[in-house]
Amino acid sequence: MDEIKYPVLTEKTIRLLEKNQYTFDVNKKSTKPQIKKWIENFFNVKVKAINSHIPPEKKKRIGPIIGHSVRYKRMIITLKTGYSIPLFSNK
């Protein structure tokens, strides 16, 4: 499935794991209901809330040509208590 690109692991997202919040980079055209349905079906969990934002573009230079980095959308998914995604388990 092309909706979810990959999980994001930074210092902030590792802190969010303690609050049962998981962060993914997704396709820019994906909507919250699409991602919620996909996460619930694929990981067999219940989603409590989804927050999303599109980070600003960063300039990229290759010689004399100036371009921009690829755009993506970042989703922070909060799961209901008692659920977790095994991909991120600490065990």
From Swiss-Prot:
This protein's GO CC annotations: chloroplast; cytosolic large ribosomal subunit
Major localisation: plastid
Subcellular localization: Plastid, Chloroplast
Keywords recorded for this protein, A-Z: Chloroplast, Plastid, Ribonucleoprotein, Ribosomal protein, RNA-binding, rRNA-binding
A molecular function GO annotation: structural constituent of ribosome
Any single biological process term in GO: translation
Pfam families: Ribosomal_L23 (PF00276)
HAMAP family, per the entry: Ribosomal_uL23_B
Assembly: Part of the 50S ribosomal subunit.
Function description: Binds to 23S rRNA.
Annotated family: Belongs to the universal ribosomal protein uL23 family.
Protein name (record): Large ribosomal subunit protein uL23c
Species: Physcomitrium patens (Spreading-leaved earth moss)
Gene encoding the protein: rpl23
